[in-house]
Amino acid sequence: YRGVVTHRPDSDYMRFGRISQPWERAPGGEGTFHAIDPTDPNTVYSSSFYGRLMRSELKDGRWTSKNILPEVGEGDPPLRGQWLAPTILSPHNPHVIYHGMQYVFRSEDRGKTWERISGDLTYNDPATTGELPFAIPFHCLTALSESPIEYGLLYAGSDDGRVHVTKDGGMTWTEITSGLPYYKHVSRVVASKYDKATVYVTLNGRRDDDMNDYIYKSTDYGQTWSDISGNIPCGPANVIREDPKKEGILYVGTDFGVYVSLDGGQTYHVLGQNLPSCFVWDLKIHPRDNILVIATNGRGIWTIDHLDAVQNEVN
């Protein structure tokens, strides 16, 4: 099965199953993150504005959806969810969901019940938090990633520039922000599939008119960071992905396109000669079909088939 789920701004989700098939409507609203159960392509988790979350299932040709947003206890501070609140499925168990508000929540039963596994991982400055319905909440989580190698090794990043790691499934968290640019929006955190101590972070400062690209790598769980932005032209970095077949190949999406590095981030090349200069929001690599799916803002979905040509450049 080759499937893509995407959303259209101020509209709904769309999905297709194979290249030759037309797009079909899927449930959703003002779309942000979504995840497909890898064991059941008819089960889709989709988030919406301010961290709302639902699970949708296709049965007998009909979609049914259930709100599964976690709740806080009586007397606890209200939840703060970014417009793009992060939701991921565990690579070790598709029934395990992680959802980021100002806390990290975990469900082990497809969203039926939730456990809060962190404290507030943001700066939580009341003077700048913002309050609905007058402002989009600030001091919220924006990125989550669990190691494909080790269950419970989880990273979280926030819109105010903080990054944390837990190595024990949320029992203890360690801040690993030192060495990263201060107070920048964490657009993506990616735990490596090749080495459990390696993690990548992209940040951007477009919200304060900083158009630099911030791309960092750590090989010691975030204790120290190295700048791997290389020769990418200035432009906020939105996403980074490892190649699933060749260690050292990295793909980066920025406000102006897609770049590939064949040497672990030392140098980059433009990828996709006919791809228009546009905001690239996400990148996904289909592991079986070896295609790169590029999600843009305003220019649709693009694919680059047969990444072998890129992978063969690395011995």
Range-by-range predicted roles:
Residues 1-315:
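Beta-propeller blade termini and top-face loops
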